[in-house]
């Protein structure tokens, strides 16, 4: 009989503190330039691996359809273990918070932890299943370029004091594919400052410049009533859409959520 494992972990949501698109690539993807940050909103995953024939069973509190975890498991191509995943979704789906990508990263990290895949394989699988997934393998704070696969980890902003945010969750989701299709070339590269500059302003807690640099290109293609809500917040706080929406955030001293220094956190690991 082989070994069985149980891994319990949290996978944290992310914000794009700024998000610009620099152009469309020859492969059809868009070149992004962004500052990513994990926040304290998280999903919970309870993963059990035991001897079997390569089956994956996912149980969740919401209807997750053809989940990204299936794509990960297909690429792993393991035929001597069965996996059961209990997934408690707290991160809204389709809102630009990276919940599915964080789940995929958590699953990949768990499979690496038990020795089914190597660290090198982890990154390759992450790059194949979703543009945001590689970030969550590093987590915390990072400058992200390319189509999301170029990760430049930087010292977590949590090392420079507390940052808190409020999230605003409209009751509709926005298709990322559709949002990208609406972008116009003349909008590319128009962010007021670079992600590197914005990161430095966060480090020095220069909130006036943080407010100036909090930018998201996708605000150009969202419904007008949503944009008006963001701009109303922006009069007093750094505020923007995250991802392609529909969630938007505002940096506030009394915000409900905090910046966190990791994308995935293992809370329990059992071997039998």
UniProtKB/Swiss-Prot annotation:
Binding, ATP: 92-102
MF-aspect GO terms: 4-(cytidine 5'-diphospho)-2-C-methyl-D-erythritol kinase activity; ATP binding
Residues annotated as the enzyme's active site: 14, 132
Keywords: ATP-binding, Isoprene biosynthesis, Kinase, Nucleotide-binding, Transferase
Pfam short name (any one): GHMP_kinases_N
Disulfide bonding pattern of the chain: none
Catalytic activity: 4-CDP-2-C-methyl-D-erythritol + ATP = 4-CDP-2-C-methyl-D-erythritol 2-phosphate + ADP + H(+)
Pathway: Isoprenoid biosynthesis; isopentenyl diphosphate biosynthesis via DXP pathway; isopentenyl diphosphate from 1-deoxy-D-xylulose 5-phosphate: step 3/6
Keyword ATP-binding listed: yes
EC numbers, comma separated: 2.7.1.148
A single GO BP: isopentenyl diphosphate biosynthetic process, methylerythritol 4-phosphate pathway
SUPFAM superfamilies per UniProt: GHMP Kinase, C-terminal domain, Ribosomal protein S5 domain 2-like
Function, as annotated: Catalyzes the phosphorylation of the position 2 hydroxy group of 4-diphosphocytidyl-2C-methyl-D-erythritol.
UniProt xrefs under HAMAP family: IspE (MF_00061)
Protein known as: 4-diphosphocytidyl-2-C-methyl-D-erythritol kinase
Organism: Fervidobacterium nodosum (strain ATCC 35602 / DSM 5306 / Rt17-B1)
High-level lineage: Bacteria, Thermotogati, Thermotogota, Thermotogae, Thermotogales
């Amino acid at each position: 009989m082989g070994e069985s494992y149980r891994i319990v972990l949290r996978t944290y949501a992310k914000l794009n503190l700024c998000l610009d698109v620099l152009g469309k690539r020859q492969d059809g993807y868009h070149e992004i330039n962004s500052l990513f940050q994990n926040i304290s909103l998280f999903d919970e995953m309870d993963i059990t691996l035991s001897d079997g024939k390569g089956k994956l069973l996912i149980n969740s509190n919401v209807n997750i359809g053809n989940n990204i975890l299936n794509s990960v498991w297909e690429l792993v191509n393991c035929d001597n273990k069965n996996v059961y995943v209990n997934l408690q979704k707290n991160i809204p789906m389709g809102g630009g918070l990276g919940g599915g990508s964080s789940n995929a990263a958590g699953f990949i990290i768990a499979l690496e932890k038990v020795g089914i895949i190597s660290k090198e394989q982890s990154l390759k699988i992450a790059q194949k299943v979703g543009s945001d997934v590689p970030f969550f393998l590093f987590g915390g704070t990072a400058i992200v370029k390319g189509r999301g696969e170029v990760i430049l980890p930087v010292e977590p902003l949590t090392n420079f004091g507390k940052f808190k945010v409020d999230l605003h969750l409209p009751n509709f989701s926005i298709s990322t594919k559709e949002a990208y299709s609406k972008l116009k070339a003349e909008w590319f590269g128009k962010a007021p400052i670079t992600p590197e500059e914005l990161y430095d302003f966060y480090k020095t807690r220069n909130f006036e410049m943080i407010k100036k640099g909090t930018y998201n290109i996708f605000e150009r293609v969202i419904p007008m009533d949503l944009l008006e809500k963001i701009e109303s917040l922006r009069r007093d706080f750094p505020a923007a859409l995250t991802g392609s929406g529909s969630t938007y955030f505002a940096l506030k001293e009394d915000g409900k959520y905090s910046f966190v220094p990791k994308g995935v956190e293992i809370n329990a690991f059992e071997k039998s």
